[in-house]
Amino acid sequence: MNIGQRYGWEFTLAALLIIEILLFGIANSRMLDINILLLSTSDFICIGIVALPLTMVIVSGGIDISFGSTIGLCAISLGVMNQAGIPMAAAIPLTLLVGAICGVINAALILYTGINPLVITLGTLYLFGGSALLLSGISGATGYEGIGGFPQALTDFANLTLFGLPMPLMLFLLCVLICWLFMHRTHSGRNIFLIGQSSKVARYAAIPIARTLYLLYTLTGIASAIAAIVLVSYFGSARSDLGASFLMPAITAVVLGGANIYGGSGSIIGTALAILLIGYLQQGLQMAGVPNQVSSALAGALLIIAVVGRSISLHHHQIRDWIQRWRNQRLSS
């Protein structure tokens, strides 16, 4: 298989991204300013940080819709620890631990109950979200303001640049590299595809399904914690609703990036490109004065188009054969 066939969808997404930026640039020249393009990634790149491990979960045949609540819980946990006087050097690792525990809870419930991951993570979505609200109430934080008073070293992080790139974007690129190497260049990563294609065959092949799923859901929890820390740095406060709007864009990015929603196939690079495509779509629409409700509706339409388009691309041979048979029947009649 040559590069064009193997990465055809990724090349398509890259081309669409360039076309999108050029079209929005015609409407508003600010979209062609490289500095604005780079700095504006901080508005949506945290979604990408979570979408990367979510890609691996979906490729394995699972799903996790609780990550938005996990982000809120991790953010509030960081705020409460800061209020308690715990230094950031300890609070940040503890926040990552909170995210990891959320992932372990998801994996344990899925494995030991055998219930559909969608149902389990729907339950933990409310569990983690309720816990975040409880902690927020105990801390005395208001819903709008959240918990503030973070050290300047933390709040400055999201505004720093490295080699001309915003730190959140650099962190995202690092996550892309790590997830790509793990998923596409390690034995454990190849196991993810096998589990997603057929868990029964994977079990007969002695693939450690439980260990792999624990790892994937834990990584999603840790990524949620990382996103929470970056969001707290970006907004300067910790709120329980910080990840509330992440669900649809993240899943849309994973599916648009080439992942089969039923498992067995997917692409880290595809997800990364899809995040930029969706993020710049919303940025461009906002610059054009389009209301947020319309951009959300377009994101939903994009998800449907992605699912239908991906399905057509995967089954184009069958569709072509069906059209040929239909034509032959018409000619014979």
UniProtKB/Swiss-Prot annotation:
**Keywords tagged on the record:** Cell inner membrane, Cell membrane, Membrane, Transmembrane, Transmembrane helix, Transport
Q: What is its main location?
A: membrane
* Top-level taxon in the UniProt lineage: Bacteria
> Which GO terms of the cellular component aspect does the record hold?
plasma membrane
Q: Give the stretches traversing the membrane.
A: 7-27, 45-65, 70-90, 91-111, 118-138, 162-182, 212-232, 240-260, 261-281, 288-308
The way this protein sits in the membrane is described as: Multi-pass membrane protein
Q: Which GO terms describe its molecular function?
A: transmembrane transporter activity
What CDD domains does the record point to?
A: TM_PBP1_transp_AraH_like
Keyword Magnesium carried by entry: no
- Location in the cell: Cell inner membrane
Matching PANTHER family, A to Z? ABC TRANSPORTER PERMEASE PROTEIN YPHD-RELATED-RELATED (PTHR32196), AUTOINDUCER 2 IMPORT SYSTEM PERMEASE PROTEIN LSRD (PTHR32196:SF71)
Its function, per the record, reads:
Part of the ABC transporter complex LsrABCD involved in autoinducer 2 (AI-2) import. Probably responsible for the translocation of the substrate across the membrane.
Entry's family note: Belongs to the binding-protein-dependent transport system permease family. AraH/RbsC subfamily.
Oligomer and partners: The complex is composed of two ATP-binding proteins (LsrA), two transmembrane proteins (LsrC and LsrD) and a solute-binding protein (LsrB).
Q: What is this protein called?
A: Autoinducer 2 import system permease protein LsrD
**Naturally occurring in which organism (per UniProt):** Photorhabdus luminescens
